[in-house]
Curated annotation (Swiss-Prot):
Family: Belongs to the chlamydial porin (CP) (TC 1.B.2) family.
Protein's recorded name: Major outer membrane porin
Subunit structure as annotated in this protein's UniProt entry: Part of a disulfide cross-linked outer membrane complex (COMC) composed of the major outer membrane porin, the small cysteine-rich protein (OmcA) and the large cysteine-rich periplasmic protein (OmcB).
One cellular component term from this protein's GO annotations in UniProt: pore complex
A Pfam family per the record: Chlam_OMP
A GO MF term: structural molecule activity
Organism, as annotated: Chlamydia psittaci
Membrane topology, as annotated: Multi-pass membrane protein
A single GO BP: monoatomic ion transport
Range of residues in the leader sequence: 1-22
Domain of life: Bacteria
Length: 402
C-alpha cells in the first residue's frame, strides 16, 4: 500500500508539472515540515508533553509567494434581457426609425451565457504564517496582482447606433438617440494595472499515519486593480483607451451624455475591477526523505466585478474633416453615398458606440492540484504546484522558519 501511494503521488507531481494549468491548495503537511528554526531551535510539537509551554507551541514562518494563473475558466454574469436600446433595424433600405424610443420589454442579452476566451491573473507577495503545535497554520500574504482578460465583443455588450438620419455627428438630435445594434463579431481585451492584493487562510493536518498526511485548507483573497488599457476591435468600431473612465449606476443608462467619449465628459468613474475569491481544499501528501509530493482537490469561487461600468468610444467634441471618430462607412449594396438633402450623412456610420464591462465569475468550481515540497535541514522549504480543470495555473512558495 505504501509503495502504491508513493508511486501515485510521484507520478502526479512530475507528470502534471509538464502541463501547467487562483489560489494554491498547498502541501497539507506544510505546518509540520519545518520543525527547526534558523534563529530559534525548534521545540516539541506535542501538546500532550507535560513539559511543553505555549511558547513552544507557537512558531513563525516567512517567505515568498508567487501564483500565476494562465487561463481561469470564467463566464459573464448578466441578466437574460438587456434594456434601454432602440428596436433593431429590419427594413431593407432607408433609415432606422424610432431610434429615440427604447424597446418596451428590452431584448435578449447578447452577453448572456458568454464565456471568457482568456483570463490571466498573476500575483507576487510576501508570505507570513503563524504555526501552532506544528499542526496548524494561520497565514496571510501581502503583495501585488495584475490581470488580462479577453472575449468576444458580445460578452461586453458592444453597442451603437446605425441608420440614423442627421446632418452632422454633432447634431442636436443625436443626444436623444439610443443605440439600436449589438456588435457580436469583434474582440474586447483589457489589461489591469499592478495593484495591491492580500489574502488570508488557514491550513491544518487532519490525519497522519507514518509518512502520509491528510490536510485541509481555507483561503480568501482580494484585490482592486484598475483597467490600464482597453482594446476594442470590430469592423464597425475600433478603438484603444489608456486608463479608461466610464459611467456607473443610473448615469450609465441610455442615452449617454453627448459629451461621452470626449475630453469634456463629466461624472465619469475609473474602471476598477473588484476581485474576490474564496477556496476550500483537501490534499494528501507522503514524505520521501527531503521530498514531499502531494495531490489535492479544491472548491473555489472567484468574481471580477467592475460595477457594469459603461465606457464610450473616444471621439472629438466637434467635427474635423466631417468626422468625430475613425469608424468606417458601411455602404452595403448602394453605389453612392446617402444624401437625402444632406440629412443622411451619418446613416452608414456607427454612432455613440460604447461597451459595458460585465461581471465575470467562475464557470467551473472544482479543480485538482498536484505539487511537491523540497525541504532542507527542516528549516527551509520550496514548494511547486500545478492546478488543472477550473484553471491552468502554477504556484511557487519559498519559506523559512524563524
Amino acid at each position: 500500500m505504501k509503495k502504491l501511494l508513493k508511486s501515485a503521488l510521484l507520478f502526479a507531481a512530475t507528470g502534471s508539472a509538464l502541463s501547467l494549468q487562483a489560489l494554491p491548495v498547498g502541501n497539507p503537511a506544510e505546518p509540520s515540515l519545518l520543525i527547526d528554526g534558523t534563529m530559534w531551535e525548534g521545540a516539541s510539537g506535542d501538546p500532550c508533553d507535560p513539559c511543553a509551554t505555549w511558547c513552544d507551541a507557537i512558531s513563525i514562518r516567512a517567505g515568498y509567494y508567487g501564483d500565476y494563473v494562465f487561463d481561469r475558466v470564467l463566464k459573464v454574469d448578466v441578466n437574460k434581457t438587456f434594456s434601454g436600446m432602440a428596436a433593431t433595424p429590419t427594413q431593407a433600405t432607408g433609415n432606422a426609425s424610432n431610434t429615440n424610443q427604447p424597446e418596451a420589454n428590452g431584448r435578449p442579452n447578447i452577453a448572456y451565457g458568454r464565456h471568457m476566451q482568456d483570463a490571466e491573473w498573476f500575483s507576487n507577495a510576501a508570505f507570513l504564517a503563524l504555526n501552532i503545535w506544528d499542526r496548524f497554520d494561520i497565514f496571510c500574504t501581502l503583495g501585488a496582482s495584475n490581470g488580462y482578460f479577453k472575449s468576444s465583443s458580445a460578452a461586453f455588450n458592444l453597442v451603437g447606433l446605425i441608420g440614423f438620419s442627421a446632418t452632422s455627428s454633432t447634431s442636436t438630435e443625436l443626444p436623444m438617440q439610443l443605440p439600436n445594434v449589438g456588435i457580436t463579431q469583434g474582440v474586447v481585451e483589457f489589461y489591469t494595472d499592478t495593484s495591491f492584493s492580500w489574502s488570508v487562510g488557514a491550513r491544518g493536518a487532519l490525519w497522519e499515519c507514518g509518512c502520509a498526511t491528510l490536510g485541509a485548507e481555507f483561503q480568501y483573497a482580494q484585490s482592486n486593480p484598475k483597467i490600464e488599457v482597453l482594446n476594442v476591435t470590430s469592423s464597425p468600431a475600433q478603438f484603444v483607451i489608456h486608463k479608461p473612465r466610464g459611467y456607473k449606476g443610473a448615469s450609465s443608462n441610455f442615452p449617454l451624455p453627448i459629451t461621452a467619449g470626449t475630453t469634456e465628459a463629466t461624472d465619469t468613474k475609473s474602471a476598477t475591477i473588484k476581485y474576490h475569491e474564496w477556496q476550500v481544499g483537501l490534499a494528501l501528501s507522503y514524505r520521501l526523505n527531503m521530498l514531499v509530493p502531494y495531490i489535492g482537490v479544491n472548491w473555489s469561487r472567484a468574481t471580477f466585478d467592475a460595477d457594469t461600468i459603461r465606457i464610450a468610444q473616444p471621439k472629438l467634441k466637434s467635427e474635423i474633416l466631417n468626422i468625430t471618430t475613425w469608424n468606417p462607412s458601411l455602404l452595403g449594396s448602394t453605389t453612392t453615398l446617402p444624401n437625402n438633402g444632406g440629412k443622411d450623412v451619418l446613416s452608414d456610420v456607427l454612432q455613440i458606440a460604447s461597451i459595458q464591462i460585465n461581471k465575470m465569475k467562475s464557470r467551473k468550481a472544482c479543480g485538482v492540484a498536484v505539487g511537491a515540497t523540497l525541504i532542507d535541514a527542516d528549516k527551509w522549504s520550496i514548494t511547486g504546484e500545478a492546478r488543472l480543470i477550473n484553471e491552468r495555473a502554477a504556484h511557487m512558495n519559498a519559506q523559512f522558519r524563524f
